[in-house]
Regions:
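Surface beta-strand/loop "capping" patches
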Residues: 146-176
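Accessory beta-strand-rich segments of carbohydrate-active enzymes
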Residues: 5-19, 34, 46-47, 51-152, ...
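Short acidic/polar inter-strand loop motif in beta-rich domains
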Residues: 121-127, 238-244, 268
Length: 448
């Protein structure tokens, strides 16, 4: 069996209940058909911040062949605090509303029809802006053979060499059962023409194992805001002559540096960042991802002179990053608006301590190959940074970023409105790159 990715947005039903509704109470409820992505709050403007528990239901038919491998359910975003049930049994949960996640549901399935139920607990207030509620980004059904390339398992880093040309390093995570494998890497230029292939053969011991390869490019076309040239790396995984998996990753050749005297340098040249902060909602359309509406927003930004986007104040949809790659928009990708100290009663502070690393891992691993991303922002206006414990959290988040982007495809940063505070300055000194929110009066003093 060869790996398949199937967009899984159709065929869902929805039911809105009170918080704490039991599974046993669901059959008698009124269900109606919905198409994902879905935001249940936007339909009634008098209840845009209403507490409620949304349930999503879908049937999943499975064959014996599919169950011989692994069956994964991937969610690009569910707002928030969701729990998945498969055939009445809890199969996994995820708390943060903006980070992508995946559940391996194989062991809960049987041949024939299976029932999927996703509970989404939305308690207000939980944010400082309109969040929406529900499965507001894409869902993907992933069918995998005995050995396959892990989700977000390809890591690409390109760097210019002193003697000329560029070297690209590729790390591929293989998951599953032991096998003798063959991996073929093929690169395509921005016009779609093949630039050649590179192969490796190895024995995969099973579990998780990373395989590395590298290749050189003499004179690649660089990615920039005016000319966003994108290359494609195709990785094919074989066992003997059988194709197990195939992944296409876009990437770009570019350097991104921050210098205290010269500012931001893209490909060695100073670029003034004309940026805006963009929340994830689409105005009257709500929070449900609509790629055409999102592309329209970004085109308007580009036309008004914007060259940089800050994803305020959370991980963006996968499509936003892809569009910014294609349109030549730089991205400050932000993860959190709060850490352990709350800004609203039911926000992510409830889950941060336990789940911060898995959220950072999801965030970084999904998007680390995108040339548009130049910064990883670990937080916005974080209240914790004025206390000594906030320094410990800063160091921990910084280490997570380096753990999942060790080659430094983008730079860690933080947006702070406490830069006059000594402890906040210590936090900023950890990441070395800080946003001075409402602190223009400190620019000259701190630069000196």
């Amino acid at each position: 069996m060869t790996a398949q990715n199937i967009l899984f947005n159709d065929g869902w039903q929805f039911c809105l209940c009170d918080i704490g509704t039991e599974l046993s109470a669901l059959p008698g409820r009124h269900w109606y058909n919905v198409e994902l992505p879905h935001d249940w709050l936007i339909n009634d403007t008098s209840k845009l911040y209403e507490t409620g528990e949304g349930w999503y239901r879908r049937s999943l038919p499975c064959s014996a062949e599919q169950l011989s491998g692994r069956v994964l359910l991937n969610f690009d975003g569910v707002y928030m605090n969701s729990t998945l049930f498969v055939n009445g049994k809890e199969a996994g949960s995820w708390t943060y509303g903006y980070s992508a996640f995946e559940h391996d549901i194989t062991d809960f399935l049987h041949e024939g029809e299976n029932e999927l139920l996703l509970r989404v607990s939305h308690q207000s207030p939980n944010t400082r802006w309109y969040s929406g509620a529900g499965i507001f980004r894409d869902v993907m059904l992933k069918l995998r053979p005995a050995a396959y390339i892990g989700t977000n398992g390809v890591y690409i880093h390109s760097a210019p060499q002193p003697e000329g040309g560029w070297t690209t390093e590729v790390e591929t995570d293989v998951v599953g059962e032991a096998s003798d494998i063959r991996m073929l890497l093929e690169v395509f230029d921005p016009a779609g023409a093949s630039m050649g292939g590179y192969g490796l053969e190895a024995h995969f011991d099973g579990g998780h194992e990373k395989f590395t390869a590298s290749f050189n490019s003499t004179d690649p076309e660089l990615w920039s805001v005016d000319d966003p040239m994108l290359y494609t790396l195709k990785i094919s995984l074989y066992s003997g002559s059988e194709l197990l998996d195939c992944v296409n990753e876009t990437f770009g050749y570019r350097t991104a540096e921050f210098d205290p005297d010269r500012g931001f340098l893209l490909n060695g040249e100073p670029v003034k960042l004309h940026g805006v902060c963009m929340h994830h909602d689409l105005g009257a359309l709500g929070s449900a991802l609509n790629e055409a509406a999102l592309a329209r927003q970004l085109r308007i930004m580009k036309e008004m002179g914007v060259n940089a986007i800050r994803t305020s104040h959370n991980m963006p949809a996968r499509q936003l990053v892809q569009l910014c790659d294609e349109m030549g928009l730089l991205v400050d990708s932000e993860a959190f608006d709060m850490w352990e100290k709350p800004k609203t009663e039911f926000d992510n502070h409830r889950f941060f301590t336990e789940h911060a690393e898995r959220d950072v891992r999801s965030w970084i691993e999904r998007d680390r190959n995108h040339p548009c991303i130049i910064m990883w922002s670990i937080g916005n206006e974080i209240n914790d940074t004025i206390d000594p414990h906030g320094l410990d959290i800063t160091k921990r988040l910084y280490e997570y970023v380096l753990k999942y982007d060790p080659k430094g495809n983008a730079a860690p940063t933080i947006g702070s409105n406490y830069m006059g505070d000594e402890n906040a300055q210590k936090c900023s000194d950890v990441v070395k790159l800080a946003g001075y929110n409402y602190s223009e009066y400190l620019y000259d003093e701190h630069h000196a």
